[in-house]
Amino acid sequence: MAARIGIFSVFVAVLLSISAFSSAQDLQIVNAERRIDLSSHIVKAFLTLKVENIGKDPAAEMLLAFPPTQIKNLAMVQALATTGKKKKKTYLPLDVKPTEQPDAPNDTGYYRVTFISPLGPGETVSLEVLYILTHSLEPFPVEITQSESQLVYYHDSAVILSPYHVKQQTTFIKTPSTRVESFTSIEPANRAGKEIKYGPYENRASYSYTPVIIHFENNSPFAVVEELVREIEISHWGSLQITENYRLTHGGARHKGVFSRVDYQSKRSVSGASSFNALLAVLPPRVNSVYYRDEIGNISTSHLRTGFRKSELEFEPRYPLFGGWSATFIIGYRVPLEDYLFEASDGRRYLNFTFGCPLVETIVNKLTIKVVLPEGSKDPSAVLPFTVNQELQVKYSYLDIVGRTVVVLQKDNVVPTHNVPFQVYYTFKPIYMLAEPFMLVSAFFLVFVASLAYVHIDLNIVRK
């Protein structure tokens, strides 16, 4: 705890020294409102900005700054330009990309937001920014018994970190319950129920930073998938086979002492409040042949609900998960090929499927998606709305001659917001669909010829 406060102090000192001799900015933030949701272990922050160009030249972009304690846990940043008011408000997505600044103070991280059109001198633009943080709630105490609730720390700043002068700003922090052990008070600040309000603060210089710490109760399931490998195998004969291998852990306060299943079943509201014994996976519609198993075998404690827009699989591991406990399991299912495989205007075929993890409110530390293309596929390419690591592999299956091309997509720090469609394009000649049937027919024909020859060949040494 003292070490964290020391790091914050050094960070603030460096920011003040940098801002003292920063050059004048062409932009300023007229008003900023930030709302931070701490209801689950995935921290969501909604930032509303009104930006003004106070320079003499048009501005085509602006910077969003994040402290080093957040940049390493930043899962996603999105920005929208807004026009109109209330029901007539329209939203236009903006291009947001990570960037580096040579004079960044103390490892501050930046994202560059490009405006739809350059912002002229004296003009203003309204933006709405969403950024998501993972692993930002620190359990304290770090170990709890089965009967104790989970308390966590959240570290942030009462004012937003920005390379621009901020005329007025307010921060609202929402906790999951009214139990708040303590919070840093930076006047004006007040707390009402589940909400803590910091501000309004006026005329804060660039790179202002006022650290705050909130200690509160959070018993939401800290479900963390250490590694998820999803294999999507395309068969032009009628279906997609999806196999998902999970290595799941509870990322909250570690469990100490003995586990009593009797207390867990009879006193569910107070025993193991931060544990979880069931998970919900949102699967595509029209799924079939669904199975759920672990190292021991199939698990029957699952319920599948199918619908027109989605399917939901609710299942229970063999034992409830407390802090520090882990479980490994596999989910598999099939979906109709015609729902996800299409033909582009240039003749190429492409798979349109959902990226991310089907489990609700789950962090995935490492996600690997393997798209297994039919044998004979060429020129594969993947299209995604964000950056991922890509590579090609080869997989051999039954009756394969040259193997099947596998498009491998890998991304770290994945959250539910990443569950968006992606496409994999490839070229395929229909003649290749006859390769495996031809091999089977050829094999049966050779066996038939060999059998026929064996019957008619005389192997006797002496002629009868």
From Swiss-Prot:
It is found in: Endoplasmic reticulum membrane. Its main location: endoplasmic reticulum. The keyword Disulfide bond does not apply. Residues 25-436 are lumenal. The keyword Glycoprotein applies. This is Dolichyl-diphosphooligosaccharide--protein glycosyltransferase subunit 1B. The lineage of its organism: Eukaryota, Viridiplantae, Streptophyta, Embryophyta, Tracheophyta. Subunit of the oligosaccharyl transferase (OST) complex that catalyzes the initial transfer of a defined glycan (Glc(3)Man(9)GlcNAc(2) in eukaryotes) from the lipid carrier dolichol-pyrophosphate to an asparagine residue within an Asn-X-Ser/Thr consensus motif in nascent polypeptide chains, the first step in protein N-glycosylation. N-glycosylation occurs cotranslationally and the complex associates with the Sec61 complex at the channel-forming translocon complex that mediates protein translocation across the endoplasmic reticulum (ER). All subunits are required for a maximal enzyme activity. It comes from Arabidopsis thaliana (Mouse-ear cress).
